[in-house]
Structures are given as C-alpha cells and as structure tokens.
Amino acid sequence: MLKFFAPASIGNLGVGFDVLGMAISPIDGTLLGDCLSIAPAEQFDLEIKGSFSDKLPKEPKKNIVFRCWKNFCQKIGKDVPVQMRLEKNMPVGSGLGSSACSVVAALVAMNEYCAHPLDQNALLSLMGEMEGLISGNVHYDNVAPCYLGGLQFILDTQSRISQSIPLFSDWLWVLAYPGIKISTAKARNVLPVHYSKRDCVDHGRYLAGFIHACYSQQPDLAAELMKDVIAEPYRLPMLPSFLTARQKAKEMGALATGISGSGPTLFSVCPNLKTATSISDWLQHHYLENDAGFVHICRLDSLGARSVG
C-alpha cells in the first residue's frame, strides 16, 4: 500500500486574488492536510476516515476522490481498480484548500500507482478541473501549491499553468481557523461583477510590486504590498472578528494579516518566533469560535504533495 500527503495552502495571499497560492506546514511537524493510501483491488473502493470525515458525503461515489479516480481513468483510457483510504484531516470550507488536498492526494496517488502516465502539466490541469467541480469554476491557486509546493504564481497559459516564486525563508505564518465553514461558492458570489478603475490600478500595482519584492528579496516591501482590494472588502461581513484580529496582530508585530482563500481562516505574517507565538496565543483565545478551531505557526512548505509511506 502506498500513502501520500497533500498539504494545506493559502490562496490569494491577500494581494493575488486567484493567481497566488502557497503550500504551508506547521513548524511542530503536524501534517496539516489530507493523506491518501492506495492499494490494488478487484474494483474501486473508498474508505473515509480522519478528524473531518463526518463533513463529507457518506456515499463514496459522491466524494471528489471517486470523481478524481474516474476522470483519471478516462484520461489514460482504462479502468484501474484500486482501494483508496482518505484521511480527511482538513476542515471543509476553511479557506485552506481542503478540497484541493483531496484532489491532489488522489491524483498524485493514481499517477504514481500507474507509473506516471500523465506529465506534470497534464496532471495539474486535471487537478484544476476537479477542483472546479467543488468551487464552481476552474482555478489553480490551491491545487498548484498543494501539488508542487512553495509559492506559485498562476499563469494558466498553454505552455505553463504555474510558476514558482521565491519567498522569504525566515517568515513565519500564523494560521487561525475559527471552526466555522464558509462556502467557496458563496464567498465568490458576494464579489462584484465590475470593479472601479482605481481598484484595478491599485490591484495591478500591489501584485506587480509584490512579485518584484519577492524576486529582489525585499521582505518589508513585499509585506507592505500585501493588500487586497478585490475580495477582502466584500467578504468582511462574513468575518466579523477579522478586522479586530488584524489590528491586534499589527500591534503585536505582524508584518501583514489577511484572509486565507475565501476564509474564515486568517493568516498573519511574522518576522520571528516570539512575535508568532504571541499572536498565536491571542488568536487562540479571541478568534476561535468552537472546539473545531485551531491555530498553527507555519512555514512555507517547499515539498508539496509527497509520499509518506
């Protein structure tokens, strides 16, 4: 039996709506993401376990993992009977790429099991297609970093879907998931159809400046430019505690704070462990709403999806 892990990811990073995403891992070694095991079988079978398995459909054929298996088999032109076991350790609707974790784990497992019939670009394209079945449209800002690791800039051209961007190895990222669910589709529906010229210019300036700061290794400039004029203003009513948390994090030394993906998870970028620990402790007591919530101090995950046994 082969086992694979697909890590959590932060979509958008505030400044890059639908075009930036980064894989993330807790510094304490916790596997924040989904694990999937695969073994030979006479027919397809899926077992679902894990901390958040009760949030998924009871019928295996309604799970995205089954649809990944089915579409992968269609791509390679033959059915491959396997037994899969999904360990669902990511909360659904958390803003941490939960569906991407399942999609990436399933497709990486199938591609490895079948001796790599799909190349990286073809596999990533299929991942985006499968993610679109959950969120309502094809996008790669979670599946690309979850699969490839690091910070990914989504190009979505004919020759290349995403490009790795250098980040800052000393940055720590505090993630706080309050324990409530926000549907990605619902979070996208609150966004306007049209934006002002001012917002478009500002968005382009912030994103281009952030990419420049990453390549020129200017962390202070990069953090200053992590501003969201596209999604955050319209999603704030769904996150009533966010502004208070961001202000407190800033007072405690955070370089930047934003909404992870569609929310409700927030991230705070910290320059050192002392600051990260202080902010983590505050969020633990003031941002979490129930026992399902959690806070992790994380680093960039440069590995992406990988074999774990």
From Swiss-Prot:
The keyword Metal-binding does not apply. Its EC number is 2.7.1.39. One of its GO terms (cellular component) is cytoplasm. Gene3D superfamilies: 3.30.230.10, GHMP kinase, C-terminal domain (3.30.70.890). Keywords: Amino-acid biosynthesis, ATP-binding, Cytoplasm, Kinase, Nucleotide-binding, Threonine biosynthesis, Transferase. Pathway: Amino-acid biosynthesis; L-threonine biosynthesis; L-threonine from L-aspartate: step 4/5. It comes from the Bacteria. It catalyses: L-homoserine + ATP = O-phospho-L-homoserine + ADP + H(+). It holds the Pfam family GHMP_kinases_C. Catalyzes the ATP-dependent phosphorylation of L-homoserine to L-homoserine phosphate. This is Homoserine kinase. It comes from Hamiltonella defensa subsp. Acyrthosiphon pisum (strain 5AT).
